[in-house]
Amino acid sequence: MARIAGVDIPREKRIVISLTYIYGVGKTTAQKVLKEAGISEDTRTRELTEEQLNQLRDGLDKVKVEGDLRREISLNIKRLIEIGCYRGVRHRRGLPVRGQNTKNNSRTRKGPRRTVANKKK
């Protein structure tokens, strides 16, 4: 397995697909990096030379990936919480941030249902 940006990428897959195993690299970013490095998208990871791997590493150094990207996202969320804006409040309460309805759904964000016991009359 080749190791790029601290991630072991699969050897048997096409390089454009293998690069998407890196957090922050989707298909479009992978295609741009490969085009910049002059490597065909159909090349298998095992067929790459050490020089080509170094070109890929240099290309990915220009893009925020893995730890840097995760850190930036968490700092952005902390900043929103700290300034007390609406989005920050939604993050703090664990509710959907982007305006979705919460009456019936939003289970992903809220977690499993907490049943409330009924009072006997």
From Swiss-Prot:
Record family assignment: Belongs to the universal ribosomal protein uS13 family.
Oligomer and partners: Part of the 30S ribosomal subunit. Forms a loose heterodimer with protein S19. Forms two bridges to the 50S subunit in the 70S ribosome.
UniProt keyword Heme, yes or no: no
Region entry Disordered, spans: 94-121
PANTHER family according to UniProt: 30S RIBOSOMAL PROTEIN S13/40S RIBOSOMAL PROTEIN S18, SMALL RIBOSOMAL SUBUNIT PROTEIN US13M
Transmembrane segments: none
Keyword Zinc-finger: no
GO CC annotation: cytosol; small ribosomal subunit
Listed Gene3D superfamilies: 1.10.8.50, 30s ribosomal protein s13, domain 2
A GO molecular-function annotation: tRNA binding
Keywords: Ribonucleoprotein, Ribosomal protein, RNA-binding, rRNA-binding, tRNA-binding
Biased composition (Basic residues): 106-121
InterPro entries given in the database record: Rbsml_uS13_C, Ribosomal_uS13, Ribosomal_uS13-like_H2TH, Ribosomal_uS13_bac-type, Ribosomal_uS13_CS
A biological-process GO annotation: translation
Function: Located at the top of the head of the 30S subunit, it contacts several helices of the 16S rRNA. In the 70S ribosome it contacts the 23S rRNA (bridge B1a) and protein L5 of the 50S subunit (bridge B1b), connecting the 2 subunits; these bridges are implicated in subunit movement. Contacts the tRNAs in the A and P-sites.
Descriptive protein name: Small ribosomal subunit protein uS13
Alphabetized Pfam families for the sequence: Ribosomal_S13
